[in-house]
Amino acid sequence: YHSAKLKFYIGDVRDARSIEQAMRGVDYVFHAAALKQVPSCEFHPMQAVRTNVLGTENVLEAAIGAGVKRVVCLSTDKAVYPINAMGISKAMMEKVMVAASRNLEGTHTVICGTRYGNVMASRGSVIPLFVQQVFAGQPITITDPAMTRFMMTLADAVDLVLYAFEHGRNGDIFVQKAPAATIETLAHAVTGLMGKPEHPVQVIGTRHGEKLYEALLSREEMACAEDMGDYFRVPADSRDLNYGKYVDQGQQRLTQTAHGEDYNSHNTQRLDVAGMRQLLLKLEGMQRLARGEVVDVEEG
């Protein structure tokens, strides 16, 4: 792909110098580089740290040094209550981002982030796998029929990033309100769209590091989140390291969480098969599949 507006570099977020070179003359940065495959990160956790944590530090330091106006870091629902190496590394990525945002006095750089769930048909996601299995005449394999995941289109994910770009302040994390579905519902929606509603589904059990459901906001974050309509904004904790004052000063919001709840894929809007099918039809590849074409549905 050729465009006068694009310039490509060979580099790596692990290589600070290559990032510094790419950052020259840049106004805005969208940091999406990551190791995101949960099982791979379970077996190679330090590789996740080097890319997701130290790589983020390299990006932010280079952006600040180059005088970049705005940086948006992309995170994941797996960073909330993390139980796997990928989620832990992305939670640390968020902490690195928020910490960097606290030290920007005298600069023109704003650093904020987004957190979202499953982007349907993205690279490495389950929908392209389901489609391949149907075409191959193999049973669709699911880990746990009751497992729920947030469902977002690629367009939704882009909208979230642009919203953060336009409205973010230093240390903010933005979450888009999204529906969810069980993996079983998703499988039946895919087979129905492909004209094979009776295609067999096989339960194989969970993979390394998987959760039954995902959360986009913890209870503690929900207590301080600002509802912005289609989005939540979680501001950075503005307190400093002067712990002496905490002897007689607390934080009221943390006492409000005892009877609250997090925002997760079990308590958000739940899609049935018909609703999931309608959401799938927002994807061009799934529209073509519904017309009987043989296509690659993977997006991004």
Language model segments and positions:
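Conserved Rossmann-fold cofactor-binding substructure of NAD(P)-dependent oxidoreductases
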Residues: 2-28
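Strand-loop microenvironment adjacent to phosphate/nucleotide-handling motifs in alpha/beta enzyme folds
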Residues: 59, 65, 95, 99-300
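Short, glycine/charged-enriched secondary-structure capping and boundary segments
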Residues: 23, 43-46, 86-89, 127-129, ...
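Residue-level recognition of oxygen-bearing side chains
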Residues: 18, 28, 54, 125, ...
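Conserved sequence/active-site signature of Rossmann-fold short-chain dehydrogenase/reductase
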Residues: 14, 79, 119-121
